[in-house]
Design a protein with these regions (language model features):
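Flexible loop/turn segments at secondary-structure boundaries
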Residues: 56-59, 123, 151-153, 249-255, ...
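Conserved catalytic alpha/beta cores of large enzymes that bind or transform nucleotide phosphates
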Residues: 142-242, 247, 281-297, 305-308, ...
């Protein structure tokens, strides 16, 4: 996987094999029957999300978040069938192959399913991710919530700077106002439904109106309600959780759309704190929000797009506008990453 061009060629070929292979008749019939029932329950022509869910046998702590594809605003059986095939094929995305190799996972030991969910109309409201642990420090007495306008993929992929809220669990349990910190994100872009129903084109990214980007995308009441639901989920699974949520702009309700174990901070020793100090001094060229606590150094390589990935050598500092999971194959090479936006 160190040769990113060879990785891209191999991954593309494997994915095409999967897409070109017809469904088994039994599976196709089962999908049709289940989708017809789902449409009836939705009451009319509804939009659906076709999502991936991967797991590895005997590796419950393996994290496959963001590795496979999700398709949003999918309408009709034919479009759902197409999306399911592409979800299955995404088990061999470049980033997924690279991740498994770096983690030492057997490609044959990873299982993948496609889930079909009715869409929450967060394109008319907001959505985001919340953690039942502080992702920076590992402190377990807070719920950390991120929120931005539109469909949640923008937050999940790190494509926007979202609003951030910290809710203190013990205070929330006492029924008192518990939002202890809030940061206003820039929220410059949002993902909404597109009028183009071609595969992979059902959503589009547009600018957020100036007034909206300069106000919070959730009220404190909504933030605390989300935190309450996050605690219920955490208590059920008995471990810190990573949860995706969405607000429906039509009915005004908050929905939980996905929950999975938090697999980074919860693995670390909560009694140990690492601190790194830069001994040298020089003029500060630029500043920003840090993700993580370590110090990286190396030759800065400015990349205009993901197509230039092969320019990165081990130890380089990757500088680009934004990264998403597709950049995973070279993230292991870089000593540090600097971007204009995302998180």
């Amino acid at each position: 996987v160190d040769d990113v061009n060879a990785l891209a060629r191999t991954g593309s070929e494997i994915r095409q094999w999967i897409i070109d292979t017809p469904f088994q008749a039994e599976l196709e019939d089962a999908i049709k029957a289940a989708f017809e029932q789902l449409e009836q329950e939705a009451g009319g022509e509804a939009s659906f999300a076709v999502r991936s869910s991967a797991t590895a046998e005997d590796m419950p702590d393996a994290s496959f978040a963001g590795q496979q594809e999700t398709f949003l605003n999918v309408k009709g059986l034919d479009a759902v069938m197409t999306a399911i095939k592409h979800v299955f094929a995404s088990l061999f995305n470049d980033r997924a192959i690279s991740y498994r190799v770096h983690q030492g996972y057997d490609h044959k030991g990873v299982a993948l399913s496609a889930g079909i969910q009715r869409m929450v109309r967060s394109d008319c409201a907001s959505s985001g991710v919340m953690f039942t642990i502080d992702t920076e420090s590992g402190f377990e007495d807070v719920v950390f919530i991120t929120s931005s306008y539109g469909l949640g993929e923008m937050v999940v992929q790190g494509a926007v700077n979202p609003d951030e809220f910290y809710v203190h669990k013990p205070t929330l349990d006492k029924g008192k106002p518990a939002v202890v910190r809030r940061n206003l994100g820039s929220k410059l872009k949002k993902m909404i439904y597109s009028t183009d129903m071609g595969h992979g084109k059902q959503v589009e990214i547009v600018d957020v109106e100036h007034n909206d980007s300069h106000r919070f995308s959730l009220t404190d009441t909504e933030v605390m309600e989300l935190a309450k639901q996050a605690q219920i989920i955490e208590q059920h699974y008995k471990r810190p959780m990573d949860i995706e949520w969405a607000k429906d702009g039509v009915d005004g309700k908050l929905y939980i759309v996905q929950a999975r174990p938090e697999t980074v901070r919860s693995r670390e020793d909560a009694q140990t704190i690492e601190r790194f100090h830069l001994k040298g001094k020089a003029k500060v060229v630029c500043e920003g929000r840090a993700i993580g606590h370590k110090i990286g150094s190396g030759v800065a390589k400015v990349l205009a797009s993901i197509e230039e990935m092969d320019k990165i050598q081990p130890g380089d500092v990757l500088v680009t506008d934004m990264t998403d999971p597709d950049w995973e194959p070279i993230m292991k090479k870089a000593s540090a990453i600097v971007t204009n936006r995302g998180g």
